[in-house]
Amino acid sequence: MKQQLIIGTRSSPLALWQAEFTKAELSKNFPELDIQLKLIKTTGDVLLDSPLSKIGDMGLFTKDIEKHLLAKEIDLAVHSLKDVPTETPEGLILSAFTEREDTRDVIISKNGDNLKQLKPNAKIATSSLRRTSQLLGIRPDFEMGDIRGNLNTRFKRFDESDFDAMILAYAGVHRLNFGDRISEILPHDVLLPAVGQGALGIETRIDDEQTRQIVKVMNNQNSEYCTKAERALLRHLQGGCQIPIGAYATYKNGTLHLSAFVGSVDGKRAIRNEITKENVTAPELAEKTGIELAEELMKQGANEILAEIRKI
């Protein structure tokens, strides 16, 4: 049995919260383990002057941590699952999917306005093309802009800016105790979340069987099935976290329901569909459901929309 575990994490306040949460859960189940954190700076933490959609997104917040994992300098990595590319590097595996926080997005506005109350031509801050596409589909008058940085930095920059509102994930806002700043929690029929939003993905080396078994105590089957369905859909569409794709799955008593959205950046074109499957009793069946819905979206024209976006 291992005596020490080293967790690799980004150094942002939210990433540290996630790593400390993981450490606490593992310590509770394995009190004999000496668990340490190793802080790692990622490309996404350094390149703050460009929109995420312009940088490219294949492992922007994960690749540097994965290098340390492959080099055996850390034993596991804790990621926001929505930041994890759908293809993991050779030799690595997502060994646990934690219970999800609320997956919805929220509006933070200067004077408490909700989506309907925001003034005409309001300036909205978000670094997500998924949010931009869905919001412009509802409010084409909005002027969309970008605020980068960790959550604390974004709140500071927002308060000092001329933006009227910004859109964030409820999970991060709640975890860092900014809940009192929320003007509105947006329902899924308004804004579908990012694939994997609200869950943590715990990554290990495939050949490190001891660590894989240790982190299994944090795996939530509901979360695993739902996020694997969402990630399979994204992978089949060859999308990334900076492509306007939203997805949300629920799982109860063997029945998996998956909703998805693909849209143009300007919000003028949007494709939505959903699927319900019974007797989903294995992760592979959840992934198969995601692929099936991706195929339906392609038949509806998702490929054409995504091809146009990739040219931008």
UniProtKB/Swiss-Prot annotation:
Its EC number is 2.5.1.61. One of its GO terms (cellular component) is cytoplasm. Its cofactor is dipyrromethane. InterPro entries: HemC, Porphobilin_deaminase_cofac_BS, Porphobilin_deaminase_N, Porphobilinogen_deaminase_C, Porphobilinogen_deaminase_C_sf. One of its GO terms (biological process) is protoporphyrinogen IX biosynthetic process. It catalyses: 4 porphobilinogen + H2O = hydroxymethylbilane + 4 NH4(+). Keywords: Chlorophyll biosynthesis, Porphyrin biosynthesis, Transferase. Binds 1 dipyrromethane group covalently. It holds the Pfam family Porphobil_deamC. One of its GO terms (molecular function) is hydroxymethylbilane synthase activity. Pathway: Porphyrin-containing compound metabolism; protoporphyrin-IX biosynthesis; coproporphyrinogen-III from 5-aminolevulinate: step 2/4; Porphyrin-containing compound metabolism; chlorophyll biosynthesis. The modification S-(dipyrrolylmethanemethyl)cysteine is found at residue 241. The keyword Transferase applies. Monomer. The porphobilinogen subunits are added to the dipyrromethane group. Belongs to the HMBS family. Tetrapolymerization of the monopyrrole PBG into the hydroxymethylbilane pre-uroporphyrinogen in several discrete steps. This is Porphobilinogen deaminase. The lineage of its organism: Bacteria, Pseudomonadati, Chlorobiota, Chlorobiia, Chlorobiales. The gene is hemC.
